[in-house]
Amino acid sequence: MAAAREQSAGGDSQVAAALAETAEVADAAGVRPVTGPGLVVTLTDAKRDAYGRFPRDASPDDLVVHQQDVEGVLNALWSAGAEAIQMQDDQRLVASSVPRCVGNTLLLHGRTYSPPYVITAIGDADAMQAALDAAPLVTLYRQYVARFGLGYTVTRGHHLEVAGYRDAVGPGRAVPLQGH
């Protein structure tokens, strides 16, 4: 009986250790939701003026948010130590996330989004704001904001929420075809 109890106690500690390791992996993989203070950055295409016009010297490319604009914001936030980032209302970014512009839309995790592009980041708001202010691509984008009317807002939040990543984590497994 004593041997059974010892074995059971050892099993309990192994289960506890496995659960702790699983929790660490889940956090690193971004599958758990995160809440906390941070920033919300919104990027929008240019709007027409009161007369329905854009600036005369603007080309169509000057008036829309591009992939490098989104990447500039994301890289600044990550470099400042963001704990978790999501785009739009439901797309948690993880190591394998690659937002891509397709025409005037953004493709992320197999879904297509139109502006405004809303980026929520959990972390030290002061550090992330400083990183945004110092990032060359964000500085260039803000010049286009001033010149062509693109949209750029940064708001602070004390209780922001970032969803957990919902898609499969990690690469799939290749299986060779029979007879080839």
PLM feature segments, named:
Residues 1-14, 62-66, 136-150:
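Short, charge-rich amphipathic segments
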Residues 2, 35-39, 43, 81-83, ...:
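Envelope-exposed proteins and targeting segments
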Residues 28-31, 74, 107-109, 150-151:
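A generic local secondary-structure boundary/capping motif
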Residues 1-43, 49-52:
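Juxtamembrane "stalk/linker" segments
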Residues 60-134:
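Soluble extracytoplasmic domains of inner/organellar membrane proteins
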Residues 123-180:
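Extracytoplasmic/luminal low-complexity segments enriched in Pro/Gly and acidic/polar residues
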Residues 51-62:
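Short, flexible active-site loops
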Residues 44-48, 90, 122-125, 165-167:
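Solvent-exposed coil/turn segments that connect beta secondary-structure elements
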